[in-house]
Every structure is written in C-alpha cells, then in structure tokens.
C-alpha cells in the first residue's frame, strides 16, 4: 500500500516540502535560520494572539491593559516578554539569514530573494507598529517621529501623514489602526513565507560551494529536521535566558512611562534592530535625503544581484570579498551603536562615515573586488 503522505492531497504538499524534499548534502548551520524564522513567526503569532485577548487599543487604557497583562493575567508576564524578546530573536535570525544569502550568493535566485526583501519590509513594518501598542513614551514619540518622515515626500507628504494618523497628531485613531494592522500583518507574512518557499523549491537550495547540488542530494527528513531541531533548541535557550533573566535588557526604560504628548523624552530611539537604519537616517542633514537613505539602506538588497560581477557564486574561495563582507558586518555594528547615541560630536561624524562606507562597500568596492578576483583566476 502506498504511504498516505505520498497520496493524500494535503499531506503530499507537506511531504514534498519538509520530508522527501531533496536537499544539498553539504549545507551548513547557516542554512538553519530559515526554519528558525518559521519558529519565531509561530511563537510571535501564538503569544500575540493571547496578548490580543487582554489588550485594549484605546489611548486611555492601552498602557494599563499591558500592566494588567503582566500583573493579573495567568502567566501574562511571560507571554508579554516572550512576544517582546521574540521580536528581537526574529530580527537576529533575519539579519543572519540575509547575511548568509549575501555571503553564499543566494541572491542569484531572484524570485526567492525579492520575496525575501518584501518579507523583510513587512516584518519591519509589523515590528514598528507593535512597538507603538504599549503606549509608553517611546511608543508615542517613536510613532510620531517615524510617521512624520513621510512628510518629506514632496506635495503629498503632509496629507499622507495626516491620513495615516487619522487626525492632526498621533492619537486614538492611530493606535486603533496600528493594532488592526499589527494583528493582520503576521498572517500576510505567513502567506508570503509560503510564496518564498514555493520559489525556493522551484530552484532548490544553494550550498556553501555555490555549485549545483543536483549530483548529490539527500532527503530533508531525517537529516535536516534533526539539524533544525538542534538550532531551534539553541534559539529557545537564548530566548528563555533573555525572558527569564533580563526581559527588559533590549527595551527602553522610557516605555514604562505612559505616553505624554506634552513631554518629549531626551533621546528618541527605536528598538535595537532598527538602529542601523536610524543612524543612516540621522547622518544626512536634509530630511528628504535622510528618508531616501533610510529606504535605500534596505532596498539596496534588491540591487545586489545586478551588481554581481564575479564568476564564482559563493564567497567561500574569494578572500578579498570575504574581508569586505566582514568589514560591512562591522560597519553595521558601528551603525547600530551610533543609532543609540545622542546627536552630538563625535557620534555625528562617526555615523556619517559609517553610512558612506555602507553604501560605498555594497555599490562600488565589493563589485570591484569581484572583478579583481576574476582576473586572479587566470593567474
């Protein structure tokens, strides 16, 4: 008798995606982060659902409803901190996942890569709107500052900002719609993930060598299911250490003060995962220029496939490109640090230099190094 997983219409799809999927035999632990992102999404949807049962999207009660969740709801504190720190884990995995794609040349699978960029933007939008919901000082002022950036768009900017706000300032209407969007977007993300996987399974996974894996494939289960479970275990250990020992480590103390439109916090800053983009935004004195640089800091990923000049897909055997990749990584760490610092000397100058280096590395230096490495192949 034929196995049910190979004949049942629904199980057949699951089988071809997660069980009998032919996978390259040599993919390293850097390939674990796709499944870890799936786990993060599941954690966020489940914890978010339970939080939504007790949260009220109203300016007068939002802050106290979050306090109520932490104090009065059974295990509410752990659900809330799992959700808040789960977002940090989500972005940590996202950045590593994108970095792996850049390092090993996965961006040559253009459909998968482009859906991935859309996913990155969607997750960033979801996280931003989620940060507004507790209605603390940083929630309110973060929402005010970031939504205000749209006013830099010529002619229609101000109209767009007021349209998003639902009035003339961030208020009840803004909070209500942000909650609605924050609730629906994870399900849109789930649909996009399915499209992402659909395109990935059309071409098959890349591997560290960047060569075709057709000659040597192994079934996904049990080899990579076990490997992914080990990665998941590490992720959960890290998440639980954060949640149980220092749940507020990555948060902002200002968000424990209820939102007050009459009192601006001394330093308005987003969560750590947005700091690199925030530093790029602040390093340009012109408002429109800053907004364009902010968008381009992420959108530049879409240009990377067009800038590829190398004859080798992976960076595994390209020492110059490897050095430049790790310089780019260090530059992103510097930008993240600068984003959390006040706007004063020497941080302004460091931020500007790091921002210039970021764009120069991706647009000019790395493609040039690839051309050089092509020449070296002939030596």
From Swiss-Prot:
Gene Ontology cellular-component terms listed: mitochondrial inner membrane; respiratory chain complex III
Domain of life: Eukaryota
Positions that bind heme b b566: 97, 196
GO biological process, one term: mitochondrial electron transport, ubiquinol to cytochrome c
Compartment annotation: Mitochondrion inner membrane
Note describing how the cofactor binds: Binds 2 heme b groups non-covalently.
Protein keywords: Electron transport, Heme, Iron, Membrane, Metal-binding, Mitochondrion, Mitochondrion inner membrane, Respiratory chain, Transmembrane, Transmembrane helix, Transport, Ubiquinone
Binding site for a ubiquinone: 201
Signal peptide range: none
PANTHER family: CYTOCHROME B (PTHR19271:SF16)
Family the entry assigns: Belongs to the cytochrome b family.
Role description: Component of the ubiquinol-cytochrome c reductase complex (complex III or cytochrome b-c1 complex) that is part of the mitochondrial respiratory chain. The b-c1 complex mediates electron transfer from ubiquinol to cytochrome c. Contributes to the generation of a proton gradient across the mitochondrial membrane that is then used for ATP synthesis.
Name assigned to this protein: Cytochrome b
Organism: Cheirogaleus major
